[in-house]
Amino acid sequence: IDINNGENIFTANCSACHAGGNNVIMPEKTLKKDALADNKMVSVNAITYQVTNGKNAMPAFGSRLAETDIEDVANFVLTQSDKGWD
């Protein structure tokens, strides 16, 4: 697990829609801790699955990112949600 790599992957691939843990497409589906819990996205496996396969307006990144990069970004998201995206 490489949180720094996860941050770099997030910045390059996710921040256009999810900067600061927000969601510009679906404002209620943020990456904040309470929203992740409401949407059952509180594990690396759940986030990894969604990043890999996509859902609704979110594209699938499984063919664009390495599995280890997806795991790193999932760990980064969970770490940031615990810290409040400061």
Curated annotation (Swiss-Prot):
<feature type="binding site" description="axial binding residue">
    <location>
        <position position="58"/>
    </location>
    <ligand>
        <name>heme c</name>
    </ligand>
</feature>
<keyword id="KW-0408">Iron</keyword>
<keyword id="KW-0349">Heme</keyword>
<protein>
    <recommendedName>
        <fullName>Cytochrome c6</fullName>
    </recommendedName>
</protein>
<keyword id="KW-0479">Metal-binding</keyword>
<keyword id="KW-0793">Thylakoid</keyword>
<comment type="subunit">
    <text>Monomer.</text>
</comment>
<keyword id="KW-0813">Transport</keyword>
<dbReference type="InterPro" id="IPR036909">
    <property type="entry name" value="Cyt_c-like_dom_sf"/>
</dbReference>
<comment type="function">
    <text>Functions as an electron carrier between membrane-bound cytochrome b6-f and photosystem I in oxygenic photosynthesis.</text>
</comment>
<dbReference type="InterPro" id="IPR009056">
    <property type="entry name" value="Cyt_c-like_dom"/>
</dbReference>
<dbReference type="GO" id="GO:0009543">
    <property type="term" value="C:chloroplast thylakoid lumen"/>
</dbReference>
<dbReference type="Pfam" id="PF13442">
    <property type="entry name" value="Cytochrome_CBB3"/>
</dbReference>
<feature type="binding site" description="covalent">
    <location>
        <position position="14"/>
    </location>
    <ligand>
        <name>heme c</name>
    </ligand>
</feature>
<dbReference type="InterPro" id="IPR008168">
    <property type="entry name" value="Cyt_C_IC"/>
</dbReference>
<feature type="binding site" description="covalent">
    <location>
        <position position="17"/>
    </location>
    <ligand>
        <name>heme c</name>
    </ligand>
</feature>
<keyword id="KW-0249">Electron transport</keyword>
<dbReference type="GO" id="GO:0020037">
    <property type="term" value="F:heme binding"/>
</dbReference>
<dbReference type="GO" id="GO:0005506">
    <property type="term" value="F:iron ion binding"/>
</dbReference>
<dbReference type="GO" id="GO:0009055">
    <property type="term" value="F:electron transfer activity"/>
</dbReference>
<keyword id="KW-0602">Photosynthesis</keyword>
<comment type="similarity">
    <text>Belongs to the cytochrome c family. PetJ subfamily.</text>
</comment>
<feature type="binding site" description="axial binding residue">
    <location>
        <position position="18"/>
    </location>
    <ligand>
        <name>heme c</name>
    </ligand>
</feature>
<keyword id="KW-0934">Plastid</keyword>
<dbReference type="InterPro" id="IPR023655">
    <property type="entry name" value="Cyt_C6"/>
</dbReference>
<dbReference type="GO" id="GO:0015979">
    <property type="term" value="P:photosynthesis"/>
</dbReference>
<keyword id="KW-0150">Chloroplast</keyword>
